[in-house]
Amino acid sequence: MPEIRVTPLGAGQDVGRSCILVSISGKNVMLDCGMHMGYNDDRRFPDFSYITQSGRLTDFLDCVIISHFHLDHCGALPYFSEMVGYDGPIYMTHPTQAICPILLEDYRKIAVDKKGEANFFTSQMIKDCMKKVVAVHLHQTVQVDDELEIKAYYAGHVLGAAMFQIKVGSESVVYTGDYNMTPDRHLGAAWIDKCRPNLLITESTYATTIRDSKRCRERDFLKKVHETVERGGKVLIPVFALGRAQELCILLETFWERMNLKVPIYFSTGLTEKANHYYKLFITWTNQKIRKTFVQRNMFEFKHIKAFDRTFADNPGPMVVFATPGMLHAGQSLQIFRKWAGNEKNMVIMPGYCVQGTVGHKILSGQRKLEMEGRQMLEVKMQVEYMSFSAHADAKGIMQLVGQAEPESVLLVHGEAKKMEFLRQKIEQEFRVSCYMPANGETVTLPTSPSIPVGISLGLLKREMVQGLLPEAKKPRLLHGTLIMKDNNFRLVSSEQALKELGLAEHQLRFTCRVHLQDTRKEQETALRVYSHLKSTLKDHCVQHLPDGSVTVESILIQAAAHSEDPGTKVLLVSWTYQDEELGSFLTALLKNGLPQAPS
């Protein structure tokens, strides 16, 4: 029996280093190839030894798919392709292809040039890795080989993020990557059609969270920022270069303009220009409002937000700084945090999820004394706020996507075990489907029922709609047609269309039953008696007496003939097509009971 096997190499009951191995009908696909931001040793990369114990990875894997440019989804890609050794195709969207190498190089500089880490990929490896990338458009069906095809759907979350459908024959898996079911200030909501996959693999970062009103969150955020700068404090907002950063920049830019504020707002050097360039380049990936107003006003050209210089961190007076990366695990955001942490006037606002092991996660867990590099202790006196502007789906959004895609089974990744367990039970109760949540290295095997996809001709559907009411969503309805196979594809069409397409002439199959009737009259008179009897009995049917003496009821033909041996007996020949078998049988039984006596 065919089956689908799924093994998380990363993000199994965990957030970070997303990497899922899927085997479907003999094809092997790796979904994402991320890095764990909470580790600085080999644990940061997925354990690729699970893929194959012998032979080259390229011989085993048919392709790699990257859902978006966040490092926990693509950070291990150069390591995997250039150091572990994979030469096959890597699929991602055009924005992901453009932005991914920039973020990889930024992180490499921090890890190697500043921290001096060994066993890390080089700049050349990033370039060589990106040469293997095949960029895809949304809703484009890409044929990886003769049997394997993939298709990308809009995921929201960040610029270029996509959900992917992987299909082999009639079997399919949908992998969501990270997605957001609610539109924000610069991106639209995730969308997928009712594709009914065998398996939906969905992220579950916020498995137990239902977010409050976005407007309330925005109001609280602006209030906290405003109050801090009013009392002379500095606000640090750690963000990743693209995505949430633009969302909050648009929000603050609008507020500063409305309130006519003069307090400086800064953004990590160079990243604003890069972000601006990519949002212009991929404007079709943004939401409808930004696309509409883009010609008159580019929302990403900020008047109040300037490029940050590291010397500004020591300037007196209030300021707001957006700095990367978003989890305070390295880079400029961590440097500024160390400088400002000792002043209670200052505030750090964490707008997104932080994985375990990062400074961001530690301060959100309430730690106020941190051991930094070189065993230095840092006392945190500044105010710490968590405000979820995360571009991940919450529990309500995850349930919405499951309802939209209608999968046969669901598998949860990219979440914390306890929260995943709660969501797993909820999905099983509400949708009556099996839901799994494997740990890293654990394999889930799903048997699948082979099915044959059948297309239905538009003409047949239109005819059905004219003849009857529209089908109800949850009530099955019979559809009559002719099943034809052409070029290895099955289609249900009308019989007329089937004959035309296959070049066949129409033949009619009729059944004839003989009914013996005691009657001494002539054949014409017997036929007239039959007509009168049926006309009075069958009020809802069209009964006709034809000039040649025969009688018809709908398509059923009745003829009276003399008996060859008994002059006092007539033979009624009742003839019908297979479509009217039910009516033909009824008339035969009725006539076998005889005709009413004619008045004398």
UniProtKB/Swiss-Prot annotation:
Active site: E203
Residues annotated to bind Zn(2+) 1: H68, H70, H157, D178
Gene3D superfamilies xrefs: 3.40.50.10890, Ribonuclease Z/Hydroxyacylglutathione hydrolase-like (3.60.15.10)
SMART domains with a match to the protein in the record: Beta-Casp, Lactamase_B
Motif Nuclear localization signal: chain residues: 469-479
Alphabetic keyword roster: Cytoplasm, Hydrolase, Isopeptide bond, Metal-binding, Nucleus, Ubl conjugation, Zinc
Cofactor: Zn(2+)
First-listed, main subcellular location of the protein, grouped into a coarse class: nucleus
EC number from the UniProt entry: 3.1.27.-
Annotated SUPFAM superfamilies: Metallo-hydrolase/oxidoreductase (SSF56281)
Residues joined by cross-link Glycyl lysine isopeptide (Lys-Gly) (interchain with G-Cter in SUMO): K381, K462, K475
Compartments, as annotated in UniProt: Nucleus; Cytoplasm
Superkingdom, natural source: Eukaryota
Coiled-coil intervals, chain numbering: none
CDD domains listed in its UniProt record: INTS11-like_MBL-fold (cd16291)
Binding site for Zn(2+) 2: D72, H73, D178, H414
Post-translational modifications reported in the UniProt record: Sumoylated; sumoylation regulates its subcellular location and is required for integrator complex integrity.
A GO term from the CC aspect: cytoplasm
GO biological process: RNA polymerase II transcription initiation surveillance; snRNA 3'-end processing; snRNA processing
The protein's role, per its UniProt record: RNA endonuclease component of the integrator complex, a multiprotein complex that terminates RNA polymerase II (Pol II) transcription in the promoter-proximal region of genes.
Subunit structure of this chain's protein: Component of the Integrator complex, composed of core subunits INTS1, INTS2, INTS3, INTS4, INTS5, INTS6, INTS7, INTS8, INTS9/RC74, INTS10, INTS11/CPSF3L, INTS12, INTS13, INTS14 and INTS15. The core complex associates with protein phosphatase 2A subunits PPP2CA and PPP2R1A, to form the Integrator-PP2A (INTAC) complex. INTS11 is part of the RNA endonuclease subcomplex, composed of INTS4, INTS9, INTS11 and inositol hexakisphosphate (InsP6). Interacts with WDR73; interaction is required for the assembly of the RNA endonuclease subcomplex in the cytoplasm.
Family, similarity comment: Belongs to the metallo-beta-lactamase superfamily. RNA-metabolizing metallo-beta-lactamase-like family. INTS11 subfamily.
Name this polypeptide is given: Integrator complex subunit 11
Species of provenance: Rattus norvegicus
Gene: Ints11
